[in-house]
Amino acid sequence: MKFSLFFSVFFLAVLHACLSESEIDLEDEEHFMSSDSFLSEIQDESRGKTCIERNKECTNDRHGCCRGKIFKDKCTCVKNGKTEKCVCTQKKWAKIIESYIGDIPALPKPVDDKCVPKHADCSKRKDECCKGGIFKYQCKCYDMYDDDGEKTDLCGCVSPVEHQAIEGALRIAKKLIGDRWGR
């Protein structure tokens, strides 16, 4: 009896702690609501960089190689004594696939907010999310209640779980194929 009483009180205490909101929780929500999408700012900053063209040196910036028609070029390094030279190259399997498929039109970039980027607010334009890797992002909304009890929507362009799983599986397959045939 004492054992079950102890665990029931313990369970109620944990349940109360989980369901109660503190002032810190409310401040975090206000900060999230007031700040624009942090991830979109990072993405905008990274888009501003210029990429290194194919067959050019990439020793100082190994992740800055440009994209080919479909796949991103890789920085391949060769050690010559103590010095190391790196050049942006295209993997053999990527070259074969790109030559087989041919020209693929480039994905349209968001110009003048024609589409809503990932993790940005899409509450007013729910059908205008940009395209991700393979699939188009979808606008997902959550109900938020402020201190006055008024309901507002918090919406953002996100990738559904099933799309993330498919893209992840394709990334792994691409890596496995690249490790076997690309070197």
Curated annotation (Swiss-Prot):
Residue numbers spanned by region Predicted alpha-helix: 164-177
One Pfam family named in its UniProt record: Toxin_35
Organ and tissue specificity: Expressed by the venom gland.
Localization of this protein: Secreted; Target cell membrane
Highest taxon above the source species: Eukaryota
Disulfide bonds: 51-66, 58-75, 65-88, 77-86, 115-130, 122-139, 129-157, 141-155
Keyword Hydrolase recorded: no
Prosegment residue ranges: 21-47
Keyword terms, alphabetized: Amidation, Cytolysis, Disulfide bond, Knottin, Membrane, Neurotoxin, Secreted, Signal, Target cell membrane, Target membrane, Toxin, Transmembrane
GO biological process per UniProt: killing of cells of another organism
Keyword Transmembrane carried by entry: yes
Record PTM: Cleavage of the propeptide depends on the processing quadruplet motif (XXXR, with at least one of X being E).
Coiled coil spans: none
GO molecular function annotations of the record: toxin activity
Chief place of localization: secreted
Motif (Processing quadruplet motif): 44-47
Positions of modified residues (Tryptophan amide): 181
Domain notes: The presence of 'disulfide through disulfide knots' structurally defines this protein as a knottin. This toxin contains 2 'disulfide through disulfide knots'.
Family: Belongs to the neurotoxin 19 (CSTX) family. Double-CSTX subfamily.
Function: Spider venom toxin that exhibits cytolytic activity by forming an alpha-helix across the membrane. Lethal to insect larvae. Causes instant paralysis and death in the larvae of the flesh fly (S.carnaria) at doses of 20 ug/g, at doses of less than 10 ug/g causes reversible paralysis. Has cytolytic activity against insect Sf9 cells. Causes stable and irreversible depolarization of fly muscle fibers, leading to contracture at higher toxin concentrations. Destabilizes membranes.
The protein's name: DELTA-miturgitoxin-Cp1b
